[in-house]
Amino acid sequence: MSAPVRIAIDAMGGDHGPEVVLPGVELARVRHPDTSFLLFGDEAAIRPILARYPALSTASRIIHTDVVVGMDDKPSQALRRGRYKSSMWRCIDAVKAGEADAAVSAGNTGALMAMAKVNLRTMPGIGRPAIAAIWPTLRGESIVLDVGASIGATSQSLIEMAIMGSAMASTVFDIERPTVGLLNVGVEEVKGVEEVKEAGRILREEGVAGVNYFGFVEGNDIGSGTVDVVVTEGFSGNIALKTAEGTAKQIASYLRAALSRTWRAKLGYLLARDAFAALREKLDPRRSNGGVFLGLNGVVIKSHGGTDAEGFAAAVDLGYDMVRHRLLERIEKSIVTRLPAAGRGSEPVEAEGSS
């Protein structure tokens, strides 16, 4: 029998704090009864909500913290004010100390990444971590990274992301040789910024052991599922992610308006209710909520700050799956066997985003 999964929760993170986080944790607990939780935050705010869920209370332990990292705090501010004593820091520190197998937070992205880097450090051979998101596509699902950890990327960091994304796809999707594409403004080899073109040249001509390089892909290829892993720098990746989420909400809004316009439309909806329910579920961004911080010596999951309980539960589910699939071990093995010797070049700029 497998050992229980221990997940550390930043109960104060996100736009709504424990009012959303704790119901989300309860939903995840029901799906994964072999899980225990460490809840970091203001005990006076946590305990009354936790009392609504007796089974979760039994499976949890509250660790009181006095400091909450604000959603608008810059990473440098968050580190100065919240290092060692905030719910976010203590949540990550539980992973470092071996008290938890994964940390989940809906807090400020830039602050969470900064604290995770300082506390957990990056794996040997990795210059900078990346945030990987599981993306619904016409073919099923794919992985897109980076979706917001850094702005800009060197050719070396793009190659590192290709290695980490490939390892994650093999783990999560059970694919022996997942295809990897570099996001670009065109598929032609002469197009794009120099860093992307150089990374493409290395992957295409020199190769990286175990990376099944497809070539350049464009924005429309993400939703089509042309490749299993899409690699890009964090600025473009975050815009693509937010655009896709906004488009899904826009389509859902259009459908609701169209199906309630006339009695014929309402009748058509009733006749095709099951099909529309399946479509609504497919378009629901909460199902894919949660980004994995790849390249760190520990599992850290970032939930959207404005999500609801179901969305936060999906982020906890993701952390559970990463632990059960032993993602860190697989990435470490991939780095040792695949990473080419190459200069890192200039470092990208750390993202300051908070969503």
Swiss-Prot record:
MF-aspect GO terms: phosphate:acyl-[acyl carrier protein] acyltransferase activity
InterPro entries: FA_synthesis, Phospholipid_synth_PlsX-like
EC number: 2.3.1.274
Pfam families in alphabetical order: FA_synthesis
Pathways involved: Lipid metabolism; phospholipid metabolism
GO cellular component terms attached to this protein's record: cytoplasm
Reactions that this protein is recorded to catalyse: a fatty acyl-[ACP] + phosphate = an acyl phosphate + holo-[ACP]
Subcellular location: Cytoplasm
Family: Belongs to the PlsX family.
HAMAP family, per the entry: PlsX (MF_00019)
Free-text function comment from the UniProt entry: Catalyzes the reversible formation of acyl-phosphate (acyl-PO(4)) from acyl-[acyl-carrier-protein] (acyl-ACP). This enzyme utilizes acyl-ACP as fatty acyl donor, but not acyl-CoA.
Protein name as catalogued: Phosphate acyltransferase
Natural source organism: Azorhizobium caulinodans (strain ATCC 43989 / DSM 5975 / JCM 20966 / LMG 6465 / NBRC 14845 / NCIMB 13405 / ORS 571)
Gene for this chain: plsX
